[in-house]
Amino acid sequence: MSKYITFRVKILTTGQVVEWLAKDSIDAREGVADFYEVDYKQTKLI
């Protein structure tokens, strides 16, 4: 069974903070970037 963790990711272009379930921090940032159609570099863990 995979363990998922809730990460808080900020989208730098909009200032929006999103909670995202993922296996690790990279997966969380990639998921938010893909879902909100922004570049990975425009996301930051908080």
Name each region found by the language model.
Residues M1-Q16:
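Short aromatic-glycine-(Arg/Gly/Cys) micro-motifs in beta-strand/loop hairpins
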Residues T6-R8, R29, A33-Y36:
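Basic/aromatic-rich interaction segments and small domains that mediate binding to polyanionic partners
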